[in-house]
């Protein structure tokens, strides 16, 4: 959240994560002249997008001199002088002025009392059935709390469906054609 408020333009930046946020921020800073390296654990950037579209993006990133390291991770980062030395999973080191962690968000449900209610969690998300009901009958969850696309319009639709189901309906959300964009 703080990266766009930097008081000076970084000379170099390592971005951990090649999802939407990592790619958008990387391209933004590259356009301004920052030397950008993106490290992505998976085999492609934007893992939820079409492979052909991602190939085009990677070609553009190459033209923009954005370095992309796929199937790689960052094991550690250490501030040394005015640089950050990042050690990659293959042992190589990358020196940059800044490191941006863009590996996604998780719901902040610690100390919320959810576990005391007996609501089942899986990897930090609330488990729901097809009707958005949790493991506790009569309690529903939507949006970023559950394992569905983290988009406002998805959460809005889920909210409508959850309310209808709380009043006795048995409706589900169709996730097959969720509009989204990458800037």
Segments predicted by a language model, with ranges:
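FAD-site-proximal beta/loop scaffold in flavoenzymes
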Residues: 1-10, 95-172
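Rossmann-like dinucleotide-binding cores of NAD(P)H-dependent redox enzymes
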Residues: 4-5, 10-14, 20-85, 89-90, ...
């Amino acid at each position: 959240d703080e990266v766009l408020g930097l008081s000076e333009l970084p000379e170099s930046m390592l971005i951990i994560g090649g999802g939407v946020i990592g790619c958008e921020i990387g391209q933004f800073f590259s356009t301004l002249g920052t030397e950008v390296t993106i490290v992505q654990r998976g085999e492609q950037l934007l893992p939820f997008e079409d492979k052909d579209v991602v190939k085009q993006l990677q070609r553009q990133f190459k033209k923009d001199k954005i370095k992309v390291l796929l199937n790689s991770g960052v094991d550690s980062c250490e501030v040394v002088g005015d640089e950050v030395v990042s050690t990659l999973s293959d042992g190589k080191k990358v020196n940059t002025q800044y490191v941006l962690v863009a590996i996604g968000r998780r719901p902040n449900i610690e100390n919320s009392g959810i576990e005391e209610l007996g609501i089942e969690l899986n990897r930090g998300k609330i488990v729901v059935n097809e009707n958005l009901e949790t493991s506790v009958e009569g309690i529903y969850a939507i949006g970023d709390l559950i394992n569905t696309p983290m988009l406002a319009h998805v959460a809005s639709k889920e909210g409508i469906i959850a309310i209808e189901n709380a009043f006795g309906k048995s409706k589900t959300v169709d996730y097959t054609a969720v509009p989204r964009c990458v800037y």
